[in-house]
Amino acid sequence: MAEAAYTVASDSENTGEEKSSSSPSLPEIALGIDIGTSQCSIAVWNGSQVHILRNTRNQKLIKSFVTFKDEVPAGGVSNQLAHEQEMLTGAAIFNMKRLVGRVDTDPVVHASKNLPFLVQTLDIGVRPFIAALVNNAWRSTTPEEVLAIFLVELRLMAEAQLKRPVRNVVLTVPVSFSRFQLTRFERACAMAGLHVLRLMPEPTAIALLYAQQQQMTTHDNMGSGSERLAVIFNMGAGYCDVAVTATAGGVSQIKALAGSPIGGEDILQNTIRHIAPPNEEASGLLRVAAQDAIHRLTDQENVQIEVDLGNGNKISKVLDRLEFEEVNQKVFEECERLVVQCLRDARVNGGDIDDLIMVGGCSYIPKVRTIIKNVCKKDEIYKGVNPLEAAVRGAALEGAVTSGIHDPFGSLDLLTIQATPLAVGVRANGNKFIPVIPRNTMVPARKDLFFTTVQDNQKEALIIIYEGEGETVEENHLLGYFKLVGIPPAPKGVPEINVCMDIDASNALRVFAAVLMPGSSSPVVPVIEVRMPTVDDGHGWCAQALNVKYGATLDLITLQRKM
């Protein structure tokens, strides 16, 4: 990759405010990119509809990997592999979406140690060490750098086909991504010379496409269109997302979201462990054979697996569908749990659902289809979308809408009312996570809670921000922290500490903190405003250091205010 691909553009170059001087009369084009764990796609609004771009091999779906076998790294956009096994020699890094923004204590990182490239951990809460095998030596890199190299190739491919510079992009992301992971995605885009208009949860992008289809159907039927409830189930190689959306007249309101980092990679690893001989390391040949078996089991009751492992070791096994489903029972149970949770959070029953939309590669697995159809009490799956293209089409639509492009036929008169996928709150009441903005709150959102001191004459308070759903802070993602100083001396429980959180339409989170005293109508010290997240690397170290340094001396407890 050219040196420029590794250069992070300056802040001014990534504002997205510059326009191409060569084409001043043309509206800014925004790409829609769906970067999947195993493959990606890229699309753009061409003036009348969404157009999915193809690579030089005429493929809409592009494998998500970067090879380091030469001095110049090459991604799946430009690099053509002679055989699938070339990606499994250690010289290629893939599954980068599963690794971006994760620390080395994360179970997903530990599961990635089975991959052909090097993944090392110290288990102390810092970024894992990853490396590719180049000329019999390990070359270190980061998931963000790998993602940036891949994004550069996508951008260059798009610019070559569109014959104009491209800067703006809408990327789809998993529901379960933390804000720290989102900032890492944005950083990779900046390294690739792209300005992020929006990081869009994948089911939200699909909901936008669904809203457009319902709007067009309503126009064709000359009606106003009644509200339709849909469940969106999206399961790819690395993540599983669920959403309940209410759609009417081109407006899609996300009523609930749920997500988990489970996907086809987990199913693949389970299958490999099942068919591999005892003490046999997972080789590239075994991975390819297991993947092929899973694909064939979508329309066959059993498959024959033949793998020559070398040195006289061979695998010859028949794998039937029931056996495959038993091996992956926990994954399928998690899929069911997510849908049940999402329906419960949306306060709807399966019988209330008008359409069941299933997308992503794993949506073809018969067991997955059966489970989700049963939970949603649907006999049929919505056939209006391509399961492998729905997310990128929705992202391209959002790119056109956000860019202010007008369509005379009204096909871009669309709006998605988003919801917060994870709760945001503070550490208080000991080691408890106290949500300030609950999960599935409509965005934009602004909420506050009151806390108070735990020590007499406590002059400072530590405001520690977390994101997640766990009851204790250790179960959640640390976003950042700051100190509130200048609290007037008073008995514990007297000062009122107001913590306000604000999430705007672009999903930016700001935290405000103020100190009030009895009899005072205004803050006694200046209000503090901090944009989150503030923590970069070293989540584990930060949390541990805060405990060692301050203990419970600057803690807060929830204040029960008299109404």
UniProtKB/Swiss-Prot annotation:
Residue positions, PTM N-acetylalanine: A2
BP term (GO), one: response to heat
PROSITE patterns on file: HSP70_3
Reported function: In cooperation with other chaperones, Hsp70s are key components that facilitate folding of de novo synthesized proteins, assist translocation of precursor proteins into organelles, and are responsible for degradation of damaged protein under stress conditions.
Organism whose genome encodes this protein: Arabidopsis thaliana
UniProt-annotated stretches for the region Disordered: 1-25
Keywords, ordered alphabetically: Acetylation, ATP-binding, Chaperone, Nucleotide-binding, Stress response
Pfam hit, one: HSP70
Entry annotated with the keyword Acetylation: yes
MF-aspect GO terms: ATP binding; ATP-dependent protein folding chaperone
Protein name: Heat shock 70 kDa protein 8
Family per record: Belongs to the heat shock protein 70 (TC 1.A.33) family. DnaK subfamily.
DNA repair is among the record's keywords: no
UniProt cross-references to PANTHER family, sorted A to Z: HEAT SHOCK PROTEIN 70KDA
Top-level taxonomic group: Eukaryota
